[in-house]
Amino acid sequence: LPLAKRFGNDRDPNLCGCFLYLATLAQKKGDYDAAIRWYRASLPGIPVDRDEWSSWGIGLAGLAMAQDRLDLAARLLSATEAADIETNRMWPIYQNDCARLVSEVQSKLSAERFDAAWAEGRVAPFEQVVEEAVSILEATLAVRGQLAPT
């Protein structure tokens, strides 16, 4: 990451895609500290790599669920589905993951809370929802003592 910033490449979609996949790998290993750092590093790629929006949204929704941030997960999933309606770029494997996560979140939240979070995710720009989610998850992990200070 320091080299990418030094040479002005931190917005390169290939580099940001690598950061996104590193976030996914760290998350699957249960290393949420590393995952959120990689998600943060990948954010500059969002405006230029719309093909990966479902990876950001679904991955962060899974991380939010792991941290008991169910309203945030619903908002992310809603924004991800809204972006897919606009771009039609969600890969089939992500469609299955998204449907599974939506069902899981919906079963854990009251209908009122789910509907409110879902409505928020539908109206906000995808980039904004993802950036806010990363900040919220960083704060959540820091409070729980899982995120080392930078």
Name what the model sees in each region.
Residues 10-13, 50-51, 92-93:
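Residue signature of alpha-solenoid helical repeat architecture, marking inter-repeat boundaries
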